[in-house]
Regions:
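Nucleic acid-binding interface residues in structured DNA/RNA-binding domains
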Residues: 1-112
Length: 112
C-alpha cells in the first residue's frame, strides 16, 4: 500500500491536470518531488477512479493499459491531441502537443 502522503500528493496533481492535457507517470512523480513512476502507477491503479485517470499516461503515449476503450471517448470529448487512431484499442496520445510540463505553476504547492 503506498504511503498516504504520497498518495494524496499524486491525486492532488492529477486533479489539477487540465482537460485536453496529459502528464506521464514520471512527470507526476517529478511534480511532487519523487522520481517513482511505478509508485505513481500503483496509486492510480488503487485510487485513480476518483480523479481524471485518463490524463495520466505512460511515456510511450499509450492510454492507460486496460482502459483504452474507456479513455478514447474522454480524450475526444476533451479534444486531447491523438495520433494513429486505428481502433478504440490502438491509438496514442500526441505527447508533443498534449503533455503538460511537470514544472507547470499549478503544481507548485503540491510537494512531498
Amino acid at each position: 500500500v503506498p504511503d498516504p502522503d504520497f498518495t494524496e500528493a499524486v491525486l492532488a496533481v492529477v486533479e489539477r491536470i487540465p482537460a485536453g492535457r496529459v502528464m506521464t507517470y514520471g512527470d507526476v512523480g517529478i511534480a511532487i518531488g519523487s522520481e517513482a513512476p511505478r509508485a505513481v502507477g500503483r496509486v492510480m491503479a488503487l485510487y485513480g477512479h476518483a480523479v481524471p485517470w485518463w490524463r495520466v499516461v505512460p511515456a510511450s503515449g499509450l492510454p492507460p493499459q486496460g482502459h483504452e476503450r474507456d479513455a478514447l471517448p474522454r480524450y475526444r470529448e476533451e479534444s486531447t491531441p491523438l495520433r494513429r487512431v486505428e481502433s478504440p484499442e490502438e491509438y496514442r496520445i500526441a505527447l508533443s502537443a498534449a503533455r503538460l510540463p511537470y514544472t507547470h505553476e499549478i503544481y507548485a504547492d503540491v510537494m512531498l
